[in-house]
């Protein structure tokens, strides 16, 4: 990825304009994505630089080109020569949302064999080049049928327990053995990417926003989840459904939802809204979103924005009439105030709030063709041995 180190707002603006917006602005060393921001204008750069410099002193700040692609994650074990890759994990949310806050799917469902081969090849080359003995974690972006490296971590990651559990490969034990001199082949394993499972395992982030007053629930580069859960099934839909339930997504009572999305998402929301309509949802939307949905044959009830007379969005939310809010915040700091009020009040009222179209699409998928009264039971202790 294209990257530059800067120290001042003027330097950051120059790099951002050379790379082209949007860009990712972040401290040179962070944990959990702390201080990371996506900037879409010079105004954002100035504000973000002030925030970062208040938190991190005397360290360079990185400005990267931001690519809206498919994020992929790989954990592997390297003995210095051979590399074992238990599996490839695909994030449902596009790049820009912290990996710890993204829904992760094993095995990856939407990438081609060509991309799989590239991911395996890059993982092997990177592990060897870095002389890794033990665990390595690599995060990739697939963008326009090309693979880019986001970051390489020569260590364990939060996905290690997940990928070990769902593949049955004890990669922590293997990493420990290779660190003390054993080899992957000597431990009885074939190097390379292992055969993918015939079931779907989904890692779902768990949030505690209702307990953290004043926290904005919109997702971005900074990690906000406080836990995770696992959904396993033989179909993608059912695995998603189990994961959503495990994460605390409440089942609909009224089948009423609010949709309010940024301008860039108005065309992409159309097929998603159509799917929820087919599931029996009544859709409320503000003027701009309602106009687009209505023009595309979707039944929608127009409602007023916060600053407009009642009944408006807040009346619907506080009246306990809404099950789901889909609200995609516009990028940039100057646009976020009204959306924050909507999201905060919704979460405090017990309403499910989704701030990514990818998550909203996943929720629709989980409700389609899933027999809610006949969910399968999966034995996690034996399924990976099949």
Task: Label every model-predicted segment.
Residues 6-11, 44-45, 68-70, 264-266, ...:
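Short acidic loop-to-helix transition motifs that present clustered carboxylates
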Residues 14-15:
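Gly/Ser/Thr-enriched, mixed-charge loops and adjacent short helices
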């Amino acid at each position: 990825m294209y990257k530059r180190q800067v120290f001042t707002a003027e330097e950051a603006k120059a790099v951002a304009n050379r790379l082209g917006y949007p860009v990712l602005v972040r401290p040179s060393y962070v944990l959990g994505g702390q201080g990371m921001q996506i900037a879409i204008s010079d105004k954002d750069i100035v504000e973000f630089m002030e925030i970062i410099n208040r938190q991190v002193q005397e360290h360079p700040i990185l400005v990267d080109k931001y690519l809206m692609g498919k994020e992929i994650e790989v954990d592997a074990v390297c003995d210095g020569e051979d590399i074992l890759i238990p599996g490839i994990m695909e994030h449902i949310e596009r790049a820009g949302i912290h990996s710890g806050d993204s829904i992760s799917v094993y095995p990856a469902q939407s990438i081609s064999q060509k991309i799989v081969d590239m991911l395996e090849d890059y993982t092997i080359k990177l592990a060897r080049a870095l002389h890794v003995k033990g665990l390595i974690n690599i995060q990739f972006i697939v963008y326009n049928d090309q693979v880019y490296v986001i970051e390489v971590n020569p260590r364990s990651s939060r996905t290690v327990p997940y990928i070990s559990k769902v593949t049955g490969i004890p990669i922590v034990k293997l990493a420990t053995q290779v660190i003390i001199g054993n080899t992957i082949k000597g431990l009885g394993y074939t190097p390379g990417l292992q055969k993918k499972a015939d079931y779907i395992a989904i890692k779902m982030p768990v949030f505690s926003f209702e307990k953290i007053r004043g926290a904005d629930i919109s997702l971005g580069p900074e990690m906000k989840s406080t836990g995770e859960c696992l959904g396993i099934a033989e179909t993608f839909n059912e695995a998603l459904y189990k994961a959503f339930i495990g994460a605390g997504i409440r089942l609909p009572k009224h089948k009423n939802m609010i949709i309010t999305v940024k301008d860039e998402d108005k065309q992409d929301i159309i097929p998603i809204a159509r799917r929820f309509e087919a599931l029996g949802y009544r859709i409320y939307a503000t003027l701009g979103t309602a106009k687009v949905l209505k023009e595309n044959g979707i039944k929608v009830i127009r409602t007023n924005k916060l600053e407009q007379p009642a009944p408006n969005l807040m009346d619907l939310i506080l009246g306990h009439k809404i099950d789901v809010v889909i609200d995609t915040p516009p990028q940039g700091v100057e646009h976020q105030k009204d959306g924050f009020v909507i999201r905060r009040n919704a979460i405090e009222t017990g309403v499910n709030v989704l701030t990514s179209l990818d998550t909203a699409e996943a929720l629709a998928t989980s409700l389609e063709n899933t027999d809610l009264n006949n969910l399968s039971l999966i034995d996690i202790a034996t399924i990976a041995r099949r």
